[in-house]
Amino acid sequence: MPVDVPRSVIAKLMFFTVAMVVLPVLTFFWLQEHTDNTLVSGGLAAAMANLVLIAYVIMAFQEDSSSSEDDETKKEK
């Protein structure tokens, strides 16, 4: 059974997938250039990965609530 997935959902997923890979790696290596402490670089890279994950969850909840409002509007008509 094929499921029709909106393009906006795929675009958001691809954006956050790339951000989850690229942002922590860039953070790690940028901090390695500016500090000699690997613990700080690794810790902040992990923090960046968590920030991307939190942003994705927030976007998912907002999308879910907006689709619920659209469904309620359609039911009222």
Swiss-Prot record:
It comes from the Eukaryota. It is a multi-pass membrane protein. InterPro entries: Vma21 (IPR019013). The chain crosses the membrane at residues 9-29, 39-59. A motif (Prevents secretion from ER) lies at residues 74-77. One of its GO terms (biological process) is vacuolar proton-transporting V-type ATPase complex assembly. Required for the assembly of the V0 complex of the vacuolar ATPase (V-ATPase) in the endoplasmic reticulum. Belongs to the VMA21 family. This is Vacuolar ATPase assembly integral membrane protein VMA21.
